[in-house]
A protein has these predicted regions:
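Positively charged, amphipathic and often flexible ligand-engagement surfaces
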Residues: 1-274
Length: 274
């Protein structure tokens, strides 16, 4: 059972609950990105089981005609198990009749994740997407590589606590780098980009860049964060809500607390019963 403290950020324990949540979003003009919670598996059986669930989830999205896609974490489907990640990702991409996002985890996974994205982006003519993190110092060169590929790229600020020698530190610095990367993406990407941000200033910046360069884009935000703003924004631009579900909620919830002071305050109020 998901405790009340985390329930604001997680859409239930089963994909049926998560899909019901997305159906409600669809009524208000927001699409869904469904993610089964789980990461860093070291047993093949667990990785295969979650890959099987993603395939079943994709089939259910199609059956229900829900406006949604799926997003998978590499370490969840076998990144730390020889051969499992590549095999399970191929199974998911081949079976899914919806768009498939590949999430980015900490810096140790970046190379293998981008390589997997490139392989499937070319094979599917762009029916997959990948996330990159603005706080990593390598992201500028990664974006130059990705600009030559089909598929979408999601830019986020980065939720992992990375070493200072490889990552930008401090909100002002990361915000400036994010803006620079966003401008490059609007100039260089043809297949559209995803702005992963709740920051009104960044979203406004993206709107201005779209007006200047004409590049198609969407905004992606999280369940439980500025949801009223998501519904308002959906009147002007495609909006996707990242919708996690499942029983393995703690690591995801902890990253959300680290990201935003308001999230931590929400958790504190929940603990105190206010």
């Amino acid at each position: 059972m998901i405790p009340p403290i985390a329930n604001n950020f997680v859409a239930g324990e089963t994909y049926s609950e998560a899909l019901n949540h997305v159906d409600e979003l669809n009524v208000r003009g927001v699409s869904g990105i469904l993610n089964l919670l789980g990461e860093h598996y070291d047993e093949r059986e667990a990785a295969d089981a979650d890959a099987d669930e993603y395939i079943a989830l994709a089939e259910e999205i199609e059956r229900r005609n829900t406006d949604a896609c799926i997003s998978v974490k590499p370490s969840q489907i076998g990144l730390e198990i020889d051969g499992a990640f590549q095999e399970n990702l191929a199974r998911i991409v081949d079976a899914a009749n919806c768009f498939v996002w590949i999430d980015m985890e900490d810096h140790t996974t970046t190379d293998v994740t981008l390589d997997a994205f490139e392989e499937h982006a070319r094979a599917t003519d762009g029916n997959v997407g990948v996330c990159v993190q603005a706080n990593l110092k390598r992201t500028g060169s990664d974006l130059q590589r990705l600009a030559e590929l089909p598929g979408k790229v999601r830019l986020v600020k980065g939720a992992y606590d990375e070493p200072g020698e490889i990552a930008h530190k401090g909100k002002v610095t990361v915000d400036a780098v994010y803006r620079d990367h966003l401008e490059y993406m609007f100039q260089a990407f043809d297949d559209g980009i995803a702005v992963g941000s709740h920051d009104p200033a960044m979203i406004e910046h993206a709107q201005h860049l779209h007006e200047e360069y004409g590049t198609p884009y969407e905004v992606q935000m999280l369940t439980g964060v500025r949801e009223s703003a998501q519904f308002d924004l959906a009147n002007d631009v495609p909006v996707y809500q990242y919708v996690p579900y499942g029983t393995k909620w703690f690591s995801y919830f902890y990253r959300r607390l680290r990201e935003r002071k308001s999230n931590a305050l929400f958790a504190a109020r929940a603990i105190l019963g206010n």
